[in-house]
């Protein structure tokens, strides 16, 4: 379930934050499954971490653009 960065850039900040919360919960569940030995696809932990990083990157890009707009006024 890899998230496309271009798709993320089109999303609103509130939607990105909701998606971030969902992915963090999913990561917690995956880590629990990993510890219990019931996780079948171990790459899903890595993929979820990368998705979280993508969302955080897009959020910081949006903050930077907003900050530049305020400074230029």
From Swiss-Prot:
It holds the Pfam family Ribosomal_L29. This is Large ribosomal subunit protein uL29. One of its GO terms (cellular component) is cytosolic large ribosomal subunit. Signal peptide: none annotated. The keyword Membrane does not apply. The keyword Ribosomal protein applies. GO terms for biological process: translation. Keywords: Ribonucleoprotein, Ribosomal protein. It comes from the Archaea. GO terms for molecular function: structural constituent of ribosome. Belongs to the universal ribosomal protein uL29 family.
